[in-house]
Amino acid sequence: MYQEERLVAILDFLKQHNRITTEQICTLLQVSRDTARRDLVKLEEQNAIIRTRGGAILPTVHQKIQSYSGRLKTVSEEKNKIGRLAASLIHDGDRVILDASTTVQACAKHLNAVDCTVITNSINLADVLSDKEGIEIYLLGGKLEKEHRFLYGSSVIEKLSSYHVDKALIGVVGISEHGITIAHEEDGMVKRKMIQQAKQVIALADHSKLGSTSFYQYAELNEIDLLITDRLPNQAFCDLLDRNGVELLVTEQDEGKD
C-alpha cells in the first residue's frame, strides 16, 4: 500500500473514531511502528491531524457560528425533514419545551397538534407558533441575545424550574462521546435546565453534527432519550448511542415506510 493510500485510511478511521493510536495503525495497515510514525508526521505537516503521545486526533475546527437570521436562510431540506418527523411525535394535549435552534423552529412550523402548551426561550419560534390555533405559548423572559435570537439568564433558568413537561426538543451543535455540546455557554445553561424539566428529551441534529464536539457541554449522552437525524450514522456511532440508551430515528428510514 502506498503512503497516500495509508494516509487516506488513517483519516477515514479518525473521522469515525476521532482518535487513533500507533498500535491501531500498525494493525489496521499491517505496517511497522516506524512507518506509522512517518505517516503521522506527514499528516501533521499537512495540518490534517494533531499528534498526541502514542497516536493522533483530528484538529478542532473553530468555525464562526452564523447569526440566527443567517441560519434561517440556509435551513436545509435535511433540517425540514428532521423538524417534520419531530413534530409528528408531539401529540394533542402535550406540554413541551422547544429551544431556540433553527432545527427546532422547523419542527414548530410543522406542528399540527392541538391543546398543546409550548414553553420556549426563542422569540422567533414563539412568533411562528402564534399563527397556529390550539397552542398556548409561554415565552421565557430574560436577557436577549440579539444575534442568535434567544433569551437567557438566571430569570429564564429560575422560571424553567417551575415547569414540568412531557417532552423537551433540543437542537444539537455537537453530539459525541463527550456528550451534548454547543458554542454558547449561556444557551447551554438554559438547555441543561430544559432537559432537567422534561420526562422525555428529544435531540435534533443533522448528520454533520454527529461525532462532533463544540465548546460547552450541557448534557451527558445518557440524558437524551431519542435522537432524530437525517442519515443513518456509522456503526461506531450507533454503538455509542446503544451504550447510552439513546433511541435513534432517521428521516430517510421513516420516508421509506411510506
UniProtKB/Swiss-Prot annotation:
Residues 20-39 bind DNA. GO terms for molecular function: cis-regulatory region sequence-specific DNA binding; ligand-modulated transcription factor activity. PANTHER family: HTH-TYPE TRANSCRIPTIONAL REGULATOR SRLR-RELATED (PTHR30363), HTH-TYPE TRANSCRIPTIONAL REPRESSOR GLCR (PTHR30363:SF51). This is HTH-type transcriptional repressor GlcR. SUPFAM superfamilies: NagB/RpiA/CoA transferase-like, Winged helix' DNA-binding domain. Plays a role in carbon catabolite repression (CCR). Specifically required for transcriptional repression of the levanase operon by glucose but not by other sugars. Keywords: DNA-binding, Repressor, Transcription, Transcription regulation. It comes from Bacillus subtilis (strain 168). Residues 3-58 form the HTH deoR-type domain. The keyword Protease does not apply. Pfam families: DeoRC, HTH_DeoR. InterPro entries: Carb_Metab_HTH_regulators, DeoR-like_C, DeoR_HTH, NagB/RpiA_transferase-like, Tscrpt_reg_HTH_DeoR_CS, WH-like_DNA-bd_sf, WH_DNA-bd_sf. The keyword Signal does not apply. GO terms for biological process: regulation of DNA-templated transcription. Gene3D superfamilies: 3.40.50.1360, Winged helix-like DNA-binding domain superfamily/Winged helix DNA-binding domain (1.10.10.10). Signal peptide: none annotated.
